[in-house]
Amino acid sequence: MSDVLELTCDLIARASITPADAGCQAAIAQRLRAAGFSCEHLRLGEVENLWATHGSGAPVLVLLGHTDVVPPGPREAWTSAPFDPQIRDGVLYGRGAADMKGSVAAFVVAAEQFVAAHPSHTGTLAVLLTSDEEGDAIDGVRRVAEVFRERGQTIDWCITGEPSSTERLGDLLRVGRRGSLSGTLTVKGVQGHVAYPHKARNPIHLAAPALAELVARQWDDGFESFPPTSLQLSNIHAGTGANNVIPGELQVAFNLRYTPHWDAPRLEAEITALLDRHALDYALRWHRSGEPFYTPEGRLRSVAREVLGEFAGAPPEESTGGGTSDARFIAPLGAQCIEVGPVNASIHQVDEHVRVADLQALPALYRKLIERLLVG
């Protein structure tokens, strides 16, 4: 069994359901220390974070990943136990195989190989891991970035190992992500009998024109490779369940995925002004998941394009699609950020898996990226 496959299996066997780490980072730190890295464990709240560095000075290249996984769901739905890694027909199965213990293991092996071959390399190679990516993402990289800001720690380049590939390893290069902003709107009315609407105020009727305007609005036309900003209503609830009662309250949950044309405060102000214009009696609660980031043409992006093209046999698609990642907390430090990882077809699903051949190739891919950036 290869080094990367053995380490991936060891990590999968640790049931690190978010925000638990289950000893993953301790095992990784032991390996990185043996390779000559300085390791710092940053326990913030109930979350484990690991900052491992080799070398000094600029440029600083960070390999960013997470050791936590989403819950596996019912055991009986899986072909084999989610935390018992199994290889069948050239495919490794287990929770975290693709998202993202395979990438983390490949980072570690690539870093070990790189510093063994280039012990006096230029700049700093760093590995940053958290156990709070799949959950609330409060005491993970978000908090670590605050610590870095206080210390004056700079980062030039960040490669996140999120599973970015779609059909074959290296076919997609993630060069940015949209921002995410969620809102919970409560519109207040007056409950009453449906036969006496003049004695009640129906919050559904009151809110409908405002919601229609929100849904119909075109926020922008997109930005570079970003699709247009989108607002989606995700949940609507009102009423008692009886068809003869006008509800006294309406609750609406919604989410915006937005381009760099916007930031959360401006979007919040726009939506608040719209609701005020409709003279609603309402309360609105916001949750900011992260601002958008975008890496323009530069050394990191051009090197990644070349390396992925060599591995995939064709230039990668360069995309800003998908959800959010921890790179959104690193980008505001001034870092150029990309995401490169295995195929994402099975992430968060029952029988999550990664092709063994892809896993075996990942360390060489990451090592080549590191060498092109820190050696030339």
Swiss-Prot record:
Cofactor note: Binds 2 Zn(2+) or Co(2+) ions per subunit.
Protein residues bound to Zn(2+) 2: 99, 134, 348
Cofactor annotation: Zn(2+); Co(2+)
Pfam annotation, one family: M20_dimer
Keywords: Amino-acid biosynthesis, Cobalt, Diaminopimelate biosynthesis, Hydrolase, Lysine biosynthesis, Metal-binding, Zinc
Active site: 68, 133 (proton acceptor)
Binding positions for Zn(2+) 1 per the UniProt entry: 66, 99, 162
Gene Ontology biological process: diaminopimelate biosynthetic process; L-arginine biosynthetic process; lysine biosynthetic process via diaminopimelate
EC number: 3.5.1.18
GO molecular function, one term: zinc ion binding
PROSITE patterns reported for this sequence: ARGE_DAPE_CPG2_2 (PS00759)
Catalytic activity reported: N-succinyl-(2S,6S)-2,6-diaminopimelate + H2O = (2S,6S)-2,6-diaminopimelate + succinate
Pathway field: Amino-acid biosynthesis; L-lysine biosynthesis via DAP pathway; LL-2,6-diaminopimelate from (S)-tetrahydrodipicolinate (succinylase route): step 3/3
Organism domain of life: Bacteria
Subunit structure: Homodimer.
Protein family per UniProt: Belongs to the peptidase M20A family. DapE subfamily.
Alphabetical list of HAMAP family matching this protein: DapE (MF_01690)
NCBIfam families the record matches: dapE_proteo, PRK13009.1
Role of this protein: Catalyzes the hydrolysis of N-succinyl-L,L-diaminopimelic acid (SDAP), forming succinate and LL-2,6-diaminopimelate (DAP), an intermediate involved in the bacterial biosynthesis of lysine and meso-diaminopimelic acid, an essential component of bacterial cell walls.
Stated name of the protein: Succinyl-diaminopimelate desuccinylase
Source organism of this protein record: Xanthomonas axonopodis pv. citri (strain 306)
Designated gene of the protein: dapE
